């Protein structure tokens, strides 16, 4: 039996181009071979002449051959199938490799920063060039709706030792559905979605979809120029939202109208989108990604997502997306054991599996895997103009013993994942270099040093880090009965001990309103809606006055009563009727907090210790906090009463004498409070709290008041 034919039949051939197509024999003859699965007859028309009938090989009947005694320049196959269906086909095996030597070198070195332009599926020259990295495969084919999903029809060739396989197939176009059919070293067939697919079928279907390069006409040049000009010190108020449940059933195009109007009205500077990358399991909220380069197809195509982002940018709103480079699901048709062996994941399960989530962990030390992830970060920033990446579960990447009893130390015997550290540094440095003004934000729950320090100084290089300590402590405090808060006063003050150790975001995220945790509204210990609303308002005012960027999950901006559930839309009815007056008041306060946050310079000094000064951090008896925020000569005094008792004639020290104008009172009637507004403060030459000037004020229960010094 012909050895090449045998390997083609078993889908184990590394070089099908050496067999298929036209090949000179050295004696003046040329043999042409083609695989046409299911064909009844095949003829080849050479140099425009009469068709030459081809003969099926005895060892492999799907392979047809013809030998002629003249030079072959151009040719096509004329194929007839059962029932008389016929077609004229161009030969895919006439072409030179579609992945060049330089591309292969850069991929092998882990340095190809535009990987999506090389691997995957690309419409070119009247067909599609397919390529995939599968280093352990014995053979790779493309299957799709263009070849009856037959794994023998279109075998790919391996390009040297790069692990890359490729084939250009004529007459395939955008919209075609496909997978890579991989034959493993032990002969098992695996049909896999394309890791580099730029579009995927919505679940439960699992095929990849060919897309043409986008010609979307962006209109956000002004925004991108602004983004590049401002630094991390710019005020940032982030609205975190889940694409599928903000308003159920909305498309990207519909969100481009409704979401933009809503976010503008509330005064947010950014939205953070959950579930942008394609994921099959909706209850995963987008944290078990199967197609890293494909936008979520439930709400529209790639250009529809571009339209949403463009619309937000034109409205002056930045776009952050959740990005999950730490782990990926074990679905058999996706990245896991991609070519039959550990490929994207670490081969040792002590490093390659995440027991908490039942997922695989990327092999950050492998060049091609690191390249896949770094290029993916750039892909979203360049191709979709994403302004920031919120990197999920960073702690699980940094520590080899994260949530593991059985773990493998690094080469120095430590618990630090040194490969992950180097990957994060490279990713951050590359994104910041290639996409001016882009942000990277770490969800990191430990005290790892230098998360937001520059890579040039040995840090990880993130722009910002979620302040998980502030979030946990402040929520623990606020859900206590006011009568007992004085015994836990440190929970509301401790965050200022480390507030300037990193560049922080204060997050009230999706994780805090699910799985029985309740919502901001339901966490409040009060029984009446009046008191609950007052507590939510005072807490939000504390959050907006505290150093750090702001992040609030959808629904918390009005105090949604029920926990978030991704399977349904938000409870917008909370805002309706007379019962919704307190929720409308919280919404009005959120809008005003955002306006003041952006207009009062003192509130924007997030990352410099000189921007904050305690007035009184130790008044646990009365559950009152008071402090100064300052920037460029502008000073703002914040006083918050977390107790259930109105503080009459409460004296606070102030750093300067004069009139302090009230700019916020959460008890104002416009926020559905009682309207106990005392107006401006006039200082007295009486020392208090170590300051020469002071003033006396009334602070209603569960109320925050802000004052600015009149110039």
Curated annotation (Swiss-Prot):
What Pfam families would the database entry show?
Alpha-amylase, Alpha-amylase_C, CBM_48, GlgB_N
EC numbers: 2.4.1.18
Recorded metabolic or biological pathway in which this protein acts: Glycan biosynthesis; glycogen biosynthesis
- Return the broad EC class: transferase
Keywords of the record: Carbohydrate metabolism, Glycogen biosynthesis, Glycogen metabolism, Glycosyltransferase, Transferase
Instruction: Give the catalytic activity.
Output: Transfers a segment of a (1->4)-alpha-D-glucan chain to a primary hydroxy group in a similar glucan chain
Key word Transport present in the record?
A: no
Give the quaternary structure.
Answer: Monomer.
What does the protein in this record do? Answer: Catalyzes the formation of the alpha-1,6-glucosidic linkages in glycogen by scission of a 1,4-alpha-linked oligosaccharide from growing alpha-1,4-glucan chains and the subsequent attachment of the oligosaccharide to the alpha-1,6 position.
What's the name of the protein?
Answer: 1,4-alpha-glucan branching enzyme GlgB
Question: What species is this protein from?
Answer: Corynebacterium jeikeium (strain K411)
Give the classification, highest ranks. Bacteria, Bacillati, Actinomycetota, Actinomycetes, Mycobacteriales
């Amino acid at each position: 039996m012909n050895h090449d034919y045998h390997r083609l039949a078993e889908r184990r051939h590394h070089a099908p181009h050496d067999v298929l197509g036209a090949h000179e024999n050295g004696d003046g003859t040329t043999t042409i071979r083609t695989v046409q699965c299911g064909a009844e007859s095949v003829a080849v028309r050479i140099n425009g002449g009469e068709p030459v009938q081809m003969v099926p090989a005895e060892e492999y009947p799907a392979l047809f051959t013809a030998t002629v005694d003249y030079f072959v320049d151009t040719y096509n196959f004329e194929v007839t199938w059962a029932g008389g269906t016929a077609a004229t086909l161009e030969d895919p095996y006439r072409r030179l490799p579609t992945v060049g030597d330089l591309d292969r070198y850069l991929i092998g070195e882990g340095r190809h920063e535009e990987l999506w332009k090389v691997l995957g599926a690309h419409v070119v020259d009247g067909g599609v060039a397919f390529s995939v990295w599968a280093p352990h495969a014995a053979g790779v084919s493309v299957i799709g709706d263009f070849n009856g999903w037959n794994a023998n029809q279109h075998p790919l060739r391996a390009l040297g030792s790069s692990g890359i396989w490729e084939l250009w197939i004529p007459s395939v176009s955008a919209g075609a559905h496909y997978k890579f059919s991989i034959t493993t070293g032990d002969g098992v067939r695996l049909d896999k979605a394309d890791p580099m697919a730029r579009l995927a079928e919505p679940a439960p279907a699992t095929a990849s979809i060919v897309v043409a390069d986008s010609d979307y006409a962006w209109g956000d040049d002004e925004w991108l120029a602004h983004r590049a000009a401002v630094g991390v010190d710019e005020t940032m108020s982030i609205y975190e939202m889940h694409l599928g449940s903000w308003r159920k059933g909305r498309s990207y195009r519909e969100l481009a109208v409704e979401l933009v109007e809503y976010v503008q009205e509330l005064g947010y500077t950014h939205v953070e989108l959950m579930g942008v990358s394609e994921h099959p399991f909706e209850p995963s909220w987008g944290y078990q990604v199967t197609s890293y380069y494909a936008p979520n197809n439930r709400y529209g195509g790639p250009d529809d997502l571009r339209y949403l982002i463009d619309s937000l940018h034109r409205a002056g709103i930045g776009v952050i997306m959740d990005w999950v480079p730490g782990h990926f699901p074990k679905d058999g048709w996706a990245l896991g054991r991609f070519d039959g062996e550990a490929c994207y994941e670490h081969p040792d399960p002590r490093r390659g599996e995440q027991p908490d989530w039942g997922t695989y962990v990327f092999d950050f030390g492998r060049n091609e895997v690191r390249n896949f992830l770094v290029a993916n970060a750039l892909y979203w920033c360049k191709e979709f103009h994403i302004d920031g990446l919120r990197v999920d579960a960073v702690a699980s990447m940094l520590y080899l013993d994260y949530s593991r009893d059985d773990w493998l130390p690094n080469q120095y015997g430590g618990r630090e994942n040194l490969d992950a550290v180097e990957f994060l540094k490279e990713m951050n440095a590359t994104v910041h270099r290639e996409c001016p003004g882009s942000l990277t934000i770490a969800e990191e729950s430990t005290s790892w040093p230098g998360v937001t320090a520059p890579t040039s100084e040995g840090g990880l290089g993130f722009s910002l880090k979620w302040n998980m300590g502030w979030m946990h402590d402040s929520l623990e405090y606020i859900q206590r009965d006011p009568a007992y808060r004085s015994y836990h006063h440190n929970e509301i003050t401790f965050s200022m001990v480390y507030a300037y150790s990193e560049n922080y975001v204060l997050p009230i995220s999706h994780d805090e309103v699910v799985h029985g945790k309740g919502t901001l509204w339901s966490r409040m210990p009060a029984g009446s809606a009046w008191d609950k609303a007052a507590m939510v308002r005072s807490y939000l005012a504390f959050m907006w006055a505290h150093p750090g960027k702001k992040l609030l999950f959808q629904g918390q901006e009005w105090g949604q009563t029920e926990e978030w559930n991704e399977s349904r839309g938000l409870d917008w009815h909370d805002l309706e009727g007379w019962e919704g007056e307190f929720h409308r008041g919280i919404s009005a306060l959120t809008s005003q907090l955002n306006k003041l946050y952006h207009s009062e310079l003192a509130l924007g000094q997030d990352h410099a210790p000189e921007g904050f000064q305690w007035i009184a951090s130790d008044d646990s008896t009365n559950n009152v906090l008071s402090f100064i925020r300052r920037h460029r000569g502008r000073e703002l005094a914040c006083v918050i009463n977390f107790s259930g008792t109105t503080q009459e004639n409460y004296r606070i020290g102030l750093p300067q004498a004069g009139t302090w104008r009230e700019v916020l009172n959460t008890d104002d009637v416009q926020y559905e409070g009682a309207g106990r507004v005392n107006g401006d403060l006039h200082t007295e030459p009486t020392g208090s709290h170590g300051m020469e000037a002071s003033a006396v004020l009334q602070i209603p229960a569960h109320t925050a008041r802000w004052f600015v010094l009149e110039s």
